Structures are given as C-alpha cells and as structure tokens.
A protein has these predicted regions:
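Mature-chain termini and adjacent capping regions
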Residues: 1-204
C-alpha cells in the first residue's frame, strides 16, 4: 500500500474567519482570503522518502461560491515560489523557481501553475529552461507550457513555443521549435553535477 505523508511547516501564520460582525456587510471571500501564511514551507513524502519541497514567501487561500453556486477554492502564492524535486536516491533532481504560483480546485479537479520568470532546472542532466508560465498535472505527473520557451543543455540551445515533459523535466520536448544552436565538445568533456556532488572529484 502506498504511504503518503504531507507535512507543512508554517512560519508566522495569520488566519481570517468567515464570520461577520453584526451590522457590517458580508465579506466577499472571492477577494478576501480565508487564510494567509507568511514564509510557507511544505514537504511531501512517499513511502517515507522525501519527494518534494515547496517554498513561498506568502500563501493566501480563497474559498467561495460563484454566481452558479459552484464551490471555488484556490491558493495564491506570491513573494517568490520554489519547488525542489528529489530522486528515489535522495538527489536534488528538479528545481522550479517563479515569481508566483496558483493552485486551483474546482469540482474536485486540481490545477497547478507557476508564473513570472519561470526557471526550470534538471540538475542531474545539466539542463534548464526559461519561460513565462508552466502548468503541472499532478495526477499525470507532467508539466507543460504554451508560451515561448528557451531550453539550454550541455548540447546547446533550443527555443520555440509550447513544451511538454514529465514532472522531473527529464524528457522535455518543444512542440513548435524554430531555432537551435549546437555546441561542439571534445571527447574529454563530461557534465559534472555540482549540486549533488559529495567528496573529491575523480577523473579516470
């Protein structure tokens, strides 16, 4: 049986109540958060192994019903957003940084997106990408964007519009590439993962 633990560490949490004072107009919870968290850190575990770290300068949670009476829920992250993804061996594999993010929940369906100066890095492969908005399908374990994207790797640069990849950014594919540049390297070159490096560097 798959064991899933989710631990949230909160620094300086402020929560607002849904009640209203007598004589005051009702609060519009579509614009007023029901919860605010400053300096949020979240950790996700699977089978007792750390899989994700998530950090944000500020998180605001909104809960309300739209004009049709449909419940709406979302969390808005601002002040910087970061997700760190780890491999089964505990290595820092993927890093996503952005200006902000949003987590929507509508009729039980989830949607994650990060926006503003999005930087996606795969440290084990030495690859990183730059774009404006990235979407994460947590159930399918995939990420994608429809925006302009630049992808850098030890082999060179590729750029275009639209990208699809697994959530670890290991097999990213640009849907509509229009430009690329290659790098010629000699046979002695190799990629060195300095992020996960432990111990002296050995060359044979």
């Amino acid at each position: 049986m798959k064991k899933l633990n989710f631990i949230i560490v909160v620094i300086g949490a402020l929560a607002s109540c849904k009640g209203t004072d007598v004589g005051n107009p009702p609060i519009d919870f579509s614009v007023v958060p029901v919860q605010t968290v400053e300096g949020m850190v979240a950790r996700r575990f699977e089978r007792d192994n750390l899989t994700y770290d998530m950090r944000a300068g500020r998180m605001e949670r909104f809960e309300y019903k739209d004009e049709d009476g449909t419940p709406q829920e979302y969390e808005l992250y601002s002040g910087g957003f970061e997700v760190l993804g780890y491999s089964a061996d505990g290595l820092l594999e993927t890093q996503i940084n952005a200006d902000g993010a949003r987590h929507n929940t509508v009729a039980g369906q989830e949607q994650w997106l990060a926006f503003g100066n999005v930087h996606i890095q795969n440290h084990t492969k030495g690859e990183h990408s730059l774009t404006d908005t990235i979407y994460w399908d947590r159930a399918a374990k995939k990420i994608h964007t429809d925006c302009f994207i630049q992808m850098y790797s030890p082999q060179g640069l590729m750029q275009g519009y639209g990208m699809e990849s697994d959530e670890k950014a290991e097999n990213a594919i640009i849907r509509h590439p229009f430009d690329s540049y290659g790098i010629d390297r000699d046979s002695t070159w190799f990629y060195f993962d300095s992020v996960n490096f432990v111990g002296p560097l050995q060359r044979f």
